């Protein structure tokens, strides 16, 4: 099963995760959220994300961010050293619900859906 991590400006990532868990409560182990507060340094955010990737237990990860070029997306693009990931920007609730419903598919197939 793929790990899915939402990385977004606070509090969007946590809010999206909570909405999805309302529909898919069994997805909690594979769905993580990383809220990036305005005052947090990119280095601190990167370390938090790397910790989530290490601790997730999944071999593949789908990283979903809010805005291309913003800190969450930049942090996500730097976190992939040695980890099999795919990064998609523009996360929204329908996208995340779809990703969670197909979380058992191969990572490349999941990204195409």
Question: Where are the regions that the model predicts?
Answer:
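N-terminal loops that bind phosphate or other acidic moieties
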Residues: 1-113
């Amino acid at each position: 099963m793929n790990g899915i991590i939402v990385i977004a400006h606070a509090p969007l990532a946590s809010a999206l995760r909570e909405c999805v868990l309302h529909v898919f409560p069994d997805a909690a182990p594979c769905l993580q959220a990383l809220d990036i507060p305005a005052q947090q340094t990119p280095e601190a955010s990167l370390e938090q994300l790397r910790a989530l990737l290490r601790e997730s237990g999944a071999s593949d990860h789908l990283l979903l961010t809010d805005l291309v070029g913003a800190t969450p997306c930049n942090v996500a693009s730097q976190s992939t050293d040695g980890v099999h990931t795919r990064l998609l920007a523009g996360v929204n609730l329908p996208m995340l619900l779809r990703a969670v419903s197909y979380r058992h598919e191969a990572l490349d197939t999941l990204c195409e859906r």
